[in-house]
Swiss-Prot record:
Highest taxon listed in the record's lineage: Bacteria
GO MF term list: manganese ion binding; RNA binding; RNA-DNA hybrid ribonuclease activity
Protein name (database record): Ribonuclease HII
Biological role: Endonuclease that specifically degrades the RNA of RNA-DNA hybrids.
Localisation: Cytoplasm
Organism: Alkaliphilus oremlandii (strain OhILAs) (Clostridium oremlandii (strain OhILAs))
Amino acid sequence: MPTIDIESAIWNSGYENIACCDEVGRGCLFGSVLAAAVIMPKDVIIDGVKDSKKLSHKKREQLYEIIKEKSLAIGVGTVSSEIIDKINIKNATRLAMKKAILSLKDKDGNIVAPDYILIDAEEIDVPTPQSAVIKGDDLCHGIAAASIVAKVLRDRLCQRWEEEHPNYGIGQNKGYGTKAHREALKEHGPSPMHRKSFLNKIL
C-alpha cells in the first residue's frame, strides 16, 4: 500500500506544496493521453488509495470524490492522438504532465504553484524541483491519488468517445488494443481519434 514516506521526507526538507503526477492511456490505440496532478495537505492519508489499476470502477469513483474533497489542488492535462502521432507517446506523456502541473487549481479556481513535484517514472520540463519515482503509484500516496483522478477522468471521456465512435467498443476497452478492438479496426478502419503511429502492426 502506498505511504506518505516520500512526501514526508520532502515536507521535512522545507517544501510545502508537493504536486504528485501520474498519467493514464499511454499504451492505448485510441484517444488522448491524460495526466493528473494532485496536491494533498501535509500528513493527510486517504484510506484505500492505491494504484488505480488495482481498484474496481466503483471504488475508484468513490475515492475520486474523496480526493477532490480533501486535496488542496488538482490539475489535468491531455494530449490528443494527433499530437501523439507527431511528437511520440513519451513526449506526449511529458507534455500532458506539464499541462497538469501548470493547471493546478484549488476549489475556488485559483492557480496553485507547487514548490516540489513527484512524478511516476518521468521528468518534465518545468523549473520546479522534482523527483521521478519508479513504481510511484505503488509507493507514493500522492502519485496513487493522481493515478485515480487520471483514470476516472479518462474513463469518463471514453464513455463520451464511445458515443461519438461507436464501432470500436471504447467504453469497454478504454482504447486499449483488445482482440475485439483490433478486429473492429480491421473491419471499419481507424477513426480520426486513433493513434496512427500505433497501428502499423495491426493494419
